[in-house]
C-alpha cells in the first residue's frame, strides 16, 4: 500500500476513535446517561447524513435516523437532542478534527519543494441566516439580511490544509480578523493578501518577521519614492518635506500599452513611509477593463453606495506590492502567483454547492449550530482524503485531480464510509483504495490549453535540487 495512503488510514482511525468520542461526549455533558441516541450515532448523523438538517422537517429527519440506525425515534426526542450540550460536543469534535487535518496534511512528504514552507490564503465566506438568529449572528441590519454569518478560513495551498476556521457574525469586517491572525506564528511563508485584509501595519509586521507577501494595492493607498534631488538647508541637512515624492499609480500607467507591465523598486507605503516594497503595475486590455468596470458599477448599485471616480479609474490596472526578491519572483510572475487566490474560491464553491453549508431554513439555533459543525467536520475529513489523494496521484501518475470533481465524487462514498470508518484501519484502507481508484478514473482535471493549473503556477517558485541542499544548510 502507498505509504501516504497508509498514513491517512491511520490518521482517520485515530480521529474516529470511539473511546475518545465518548469521552468528549461525557465531558461536554452531551451523554449523561444511557439513551437511544449514542455519541457515535449523533456524530455520524450530523457529519455523513447532515446536509438537510436545516432544511428537512423533523419528521423526515427522524425517519432517516430510523432508516440508518434501525431506531424508532420520535421527532420530539430528536429535537431535544439539539441543545447546548450537543453544540458543545460537536464544537469539540470539530476542534479535534481541525488539528488532525492540519497534522495529517502538513506531515505528508511534499511533491513540490518551493522557496516557501507555506503559501497561505485568507478569505471568508458569508451567507444569510433566518432572521430568528440575529441576536447570535447579526447581519447588516437591512431587510435583506437581518442575520448573517461569516466563516474565516486560513488555507495553505501547498498541502490543502485548513490552517484555521473561525466563525463570526456577518457584520465582522475582514480587516478585523487581522487581530485574530496575530496569534498564529509566521514561518517561512508566502501570504497572498486580499484587499479585504489590506492594512499597512499588518504587512509591516509580516515584513519584519521575515514573512513574504504579495498584496493588491488599494486605490487610496499613499505611495512614495525617495527624491533623488531633495531640497537642503544651508547646513546640508535634507528638508523633510522634500525627502519623498508621492506617486500616482493611474498616471504612471497612462503611457503604457494594453497588457504592458512595469516595476518600481524601493517604493514606500503609507504616510509614515515605514514599509518598503516592490510595486508592479499592469495596464489592462480594454476587454478586461470593461468587465471590471461593469462588475464594479453593479456592485455599487447592489450595495447602494456612492460611485468614487478614482476607484472606478483603478479598474484599468492591476497593482501589486511585494517584499519578495525579484531573484525569486519576476515582475511578470507576480500576477500569476497572486491569481492562486482563486483556489480558495474553489474551496468555498465546494462548501456551498456540494456540502450545502449555506442552505438554512428557520430552525432552532442549536440545530443550526450542530449542522454547521457537522458540515465543517465533513469538510475537514473530505479535504484530508482529497488532498492526500491529490498528492499520491500527482506523484505516482503525474496527473492533477480536480478538487470540484474529487469532493463531488467523495460524498457518494459517505453512506459506506460512515460505518467502515469506525471498524478499524483495514476497513478504512479498503475504502480509501476504492476512493483513490475513483479519483484516477473520474476525477482527473481536464486539460485547458489556455489556462495554467495551480500546480503549474507553483512551479514558478520551485526549488531546484541544488537549491534544496543550499536552503537546508
From Swiss-Prot:
GO BP terms in the entry? DNA transposition
InterPro entries (UniProt xref): RNaseH-like_sf (IPR012337), Transpos_IS4 (IPR047952), Transposase_11 (IPR002559)
- Which key words are in the record? DNA recombination, DNA-binding, Transposable element, Transposition
GO molecular function of the protein, one example?
A: DNA binding
Q: Name one Pfam family in it.
A: DDE_Tnp_1
| Domain of life according to the entry | Bacteria
Please explain the role this protein plays, according to its UniProt record. Answer: Involved in the transposition of the insertion sequence.
**What family classification does the UniProt entry report for this protein?**
Belongs to the transposase 11 family.
Official protein name in the record: Transposase for insertion sequence element IS1151
Amino acid at each position: 500500500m502507498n505509504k501516504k495512503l497508509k498514513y491517512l488510514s491511520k490518521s482517520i482511525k485515530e480521529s474516529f476513535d470511539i473511546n475518545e468520542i465518548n469521552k468528549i461526549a461525557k465531558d461536554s455533558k452531551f451523554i449523561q446517561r444511557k439513551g437511544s441516541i449514542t455519541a457515535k450515532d449523533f456524530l455520524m448523523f450530523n457529519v455523513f447524513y447532515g446536509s438537510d438538517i436545516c432544511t428537512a422537517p423533523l419528521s423526515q429527519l427522524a425517519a432517516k435516523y430510523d432508516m440508518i440506525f434501525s431506531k424508532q425515534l420520535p421527532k420530539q426526542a430528536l429535537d431535544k437532542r439539539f441543545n447546548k450540550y450537543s453544540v458543545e460536543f460537536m464544537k469539540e469534535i470539530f476542534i479535534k478534527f481541525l488539528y488532525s487535518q492540519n497534522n495529517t496534511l502538513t506531515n505528508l512528504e511534499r511533491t513540490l519543494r518551493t522557496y516557501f514552507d507555506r503559501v497561505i490564503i485568507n478569505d471568508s465566506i458569508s451567507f444569510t441566516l433566518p432572521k430568528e438568529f440575529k441576536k447570535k449572528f447579526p447581519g447588516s441590519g437591512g431587510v435583506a439580511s437581518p442575520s448573517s454569518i461569516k466563516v474565516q478560513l486560513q488555507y495553505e495551498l501547498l498541502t490543502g490544509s485548513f490552517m484555521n476556521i473561525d466563525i463570526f457574525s456577518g457584520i465582522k469586517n475582514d480587516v478585523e480578523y487581522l487581530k485574530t491572525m496575530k496569534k498564529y506564528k509566521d514561518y517561512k511563508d508566502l501570504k497572498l493578501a486580499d484587499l479585504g485584509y489590506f492594512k499597512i501595519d499588518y504587512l509591516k509586521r509580516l515584513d519584519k518577521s521575515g514573512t513574504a507577501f504579495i498584496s493588491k494595492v488599494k486605490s487610496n493607498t499613499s505611495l512614495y519614492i525617495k527624491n533623488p534631488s531633495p531640497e537642503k538647508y544651508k547646513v546640508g541637512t535634507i528638508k523633510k518635506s522634500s525627502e519623498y515624492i508621492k506617486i500616482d499609480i493611474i498616471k504612471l500607467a497612462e503611457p503604457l500599452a494594453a497588457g504592458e507591465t512595469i516595476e518600481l523598486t524601493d517604493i514606500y507605503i503609507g504616510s509614515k513611509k515605514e514599509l518598503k516594497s516592490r510595486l508592479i503595475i499592469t495596464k489592462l486590455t480594454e476587454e478586461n477593463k470593461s468587465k471590471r468596470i461593469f462588475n464594479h458599477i453593479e456592485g455599487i448599485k447592489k450595495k447602494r453606495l456612492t460611485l468614487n471616480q478614482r476607484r472606478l479609474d483603478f479598474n484599468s490596472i492591476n497593482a501589486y506590492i511585494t517584499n519578495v526578491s525579484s531573484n525569486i519572483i519576476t515582475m511578470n510572475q507576480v500576477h500569476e502567483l497572486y491569481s492562486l487566490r482563486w483556489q480558495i474560491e474553489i474551496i468555498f464553491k465546494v462548501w456551498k454547492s456540494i456540502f450545502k453549508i449555506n442552505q438554512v431554513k428557520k430552525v432552532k439555533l442549536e440545530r443550526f449550530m450542530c449542522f454547521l459543525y457537522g458540515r465543517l467536520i465533513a469538510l475537514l475529513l473530505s479535504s484530508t482524503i482529497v488532498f492526500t489523494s491529490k498528492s499520491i496521484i500527482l506523484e505516482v501518475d503525474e496527473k492533477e485531480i480536480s478538487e470540484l470533481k474529487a469532493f463531488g465524487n467523495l460524498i457518494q462514498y459517505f453512506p459506506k464510509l460512515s460505518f467502515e470508518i469506525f471498524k478499524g484501519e483495514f476497513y478504512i484502507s479498503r475504502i480509501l483504495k476504492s476512493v483513490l481508484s475513483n479519483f484516477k478514473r473520474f476525477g482527473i482535471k481536464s486539460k485547458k490549453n489556455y489556462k495554467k493549473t495551480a500546480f503549474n503556477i507553483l512551479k514558478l517558485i520551485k526549488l531546484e535540487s541544488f537549491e534544496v541542499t543550499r536552503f537546508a544548510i
